[in-house]
């Protein structure tokens, strides 16, 4: 199991410049941890850039993974990570979910650069 950050889903869905790097992880969607905050960000992005129908298709793909809702324990862990690593709310929730599930976070978001258990792809 792994957690692919929102930027990874976007790269993969749009065949972006890093799509081939994410493809290795996206081949088995069922093995991906998907925080509901990633679903929120992906839906918001796809609705804005594409349309509601495409946004719902993207969310349907995420539903094939293991969707993790925001819980009290993840919220508290995120609060600690936000303070310790100066992460935004959404980034802290995503990182806390990965840590709570004991999986690596796969991302190209610089906010996660050099954090433990992160695989980072430079844009």
Regions found by a protein language model. Give the residues of each.
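A generic structural signal for short hydrophobic patches within well-formed alpha-helices
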Residues: 9-10, 39, 75, 112-113
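Active-site neighborhoods of divalent-metal-dependent phosphate/nucleic-acid chemistry enzymes
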Residues: 67-108
